[in-house]
Amino acid sequence: MPNPTARHSAARGQRGQEPAFRIQLHKNKIKPNHPACSPQARAARATPSRPRGTRVTAGTDVANIKIMKKGLIALAFGTLALGMTEFVMMGILPDIARGLGITIIQAGHLISAYAIGVCCGAPLLTVAHKYSPKRILLVLAAMMLLGAVLCAVSPTYGMMLAARFIAGLPHGAYFGVASIAAIRLADERHKTGAVSIMVAGMTIANLFGVPLSTALSGNISWRVPFVLVALLSLLVLYYIWKWVPHIDPLPDNGYKGQFRFLRSSAPWLILAATMLGNGGIFCWYSYVTPLMTTEGGFPPETMSLLMVAAGFGMVVGNLTSGRLSDRYSPGRVAACTQAVVVAALLLIFALAQYGWLTAGLMVVCTAG
């Protein structure tokens, strides 16, 4: 219910401003029925304008919605580049093995080298927290560019291993810093949705990036997908510099203070869910082709279309879960979606011989 005191104070202030305004109307020979005399115009004059160029600090909302959208798009470009860098190996591994004169098993170590880089690079975030998130993101984007260029030009297997390790270093740290930036860019009602938009680049990489990289490798060269990732990383560097506003560093709680949250059980549960989820994704990537071709009866040449459908499920699930988490409890949304995934997996196990049904259930699983 409106406060009567505030309402009467506002009315007195408005009556105090009216004589001066009427004098100005008389001087300019403006009639009382002029649009400038309408209630909407008076309200606009009474509303103070928000200063431009406001720095984004903790707890401060971004006034201009365009700044928020551009910032989130720039962050999503970064996750798109990382998604392509990570998953590009799945479709071009045989081509790399032939190009470098190595076995498939040796080529598989290139995936492990990237994973080791991810594990080594993520802790760097603990020593870089005193800097602005924008500055950290720029450094990480430069590392993404360096790793992609080295992968594209590596002449030997040893150099390719080192290049994949370097390419993996910014992965974990980027997701951590970009999540902080996305939360600080959004208002209180849309923080979860902002993070889902940032992560959407990873799912888009599965939808378009992986099939495109496979086609480029098969028709031109396995080095072309890495050139594409390098160009994308260059765009990420530019868009972060151009579109992401300045964000103040997080408060310094000391080195030990950064790990105080681990005393709670919630972070460990989230870590376990993340480990199991990522492990499941890589198992799915490893065995989806024999499942769909041997059990589902699909021809091998249709696998690229099935992968596009799976990527579409990831995009829809990512964006939908973000919106639902803004409205309901994130824990409740996660529990419901995982229950649907478990049911779909059990149906795939029992009904794998029905190809199109299995394909539809596969999309449901990737959406979850």
Roles of regions detected by a PLM:
Residues 77-109, 122-125, 284-289:
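Extracytoplasmic
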Residues 101, 153-159, 297, 329, ...:
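Helix-breaking motifs and short loop linkers at transmembrane-helix boundaries and internal kinks
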Residues 120-158:
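Conserved MFS/SLC helix-loop-helix module at the cytosolic interface between two early adjacent transmembrane helices
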Residues 122-133, 317-329:
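Helix-to-loop junctions at the C-terminal end of transmembrane segments
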Residues 147, 158-167, 356-364:
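Paired small-residue
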Residues 157-159, 188-242, 287, 291:
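Helix-loop-helix hairpin linking two adjacent transmembrane segments in secondary transporters
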Residues 163-201:
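Cytoplasmic helix-loop-helix junction between adjacent transmembrane helices
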Residues 331-368:
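C-terminal transmembrane helical hairpin of 12-TM major facilitator-type secondary transporters
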